[in-house]
Design a protein with these regions (language model features):
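Short, surface-exposed loop or secondary-structure junction motifs
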Residues: 1-151
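Short acidic-glycine loop/turn motifs at beta-strand connectors
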Residues: 136, 164-167
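Short, small/polar residue-rich loop motifs at catalytic or cofactor-binding pockets
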Residues: 155-157
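Short, well-ordered beta-strand elements
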Residues: 167-177
């Protein structure tokens, strides 16, 4: 059998795995008694008026990524990701989501500190809280000026969404190569 990376609940330990999001998606489906697409539409996409955001299906069409000059079409892999990466969006819609996430439009802002239990993960200098990442550079990595911390998430397929609390700055983007 497989051995765990550490005993569950060990202070300061975290291991990033997309399966955590998939499990959360399954729990949401059981509680709400709806499909994931309907849950996203009801609680996130429609309330935030995200016009270019959807849960990918096998028949979905969107821009390919490129490997050198070769386009790679990936709706099958993205549609199979579900809660762990099956959302397709634009940088603009991702910005709306990010600002809403940190301003209390999705849930009370008082819940945010509960997500900030930072643990080191394998991708230094990234740390992981509950569902979100933090990047906090050491002075060794940023010797000329202190780099402010950013919190948010990087996506599996070339997207990122981060918030810099000390500057009240929101950063989103997408890449396809």
């Amino acid at each position: 059998g497989m051995k765990p990376h550490f005993i569950n609940g060990t202070k300061g330990k975290a291991f990033y795995a997309d399966i955590n999001f998939d499990l959360l998606g399954e729990i949401a489906k059981k509680i709400v008694q709806k499909e994931l697409e309907d849950i996203y539409n009801q609680f996130i996409i429609k309330p935030l008026e995200l016009e270019h955001t959807f849960l990918c299906k096998k028949t979905s069409s969107f821009a390919p990524i490129y490997l050198n000059a070769t386009p790679l079409y990936r709706p099958l892999i993205v549609s199979s990701a579900g809660a762990s990466g099956g959302i397709v969006s634009t940088a603009q819609d991702t910005m709306k989501f990010l600002k809403s996430f940190y301003s209390g439009k999705l849930f009370k802002e008082t819940y945010l500190p509960m997500l900030y239990r930072w643990n080191r993960i394998r991708w230094y200098p990234m740390e992981y809280g509950i569902g979100i990442m933090r990047c906090k550079m050491s002075r060794l990595m940023s010797p000329f000026f202190p780099a402010p911390e950013i919190i948010g998430h990087s996506g599996s397929f070339g997207t990122f969404a981060f918030y810099c609390p000390s500057k009240n700055l929101f950063i989103t983007g997408t890449i396809n190569q």
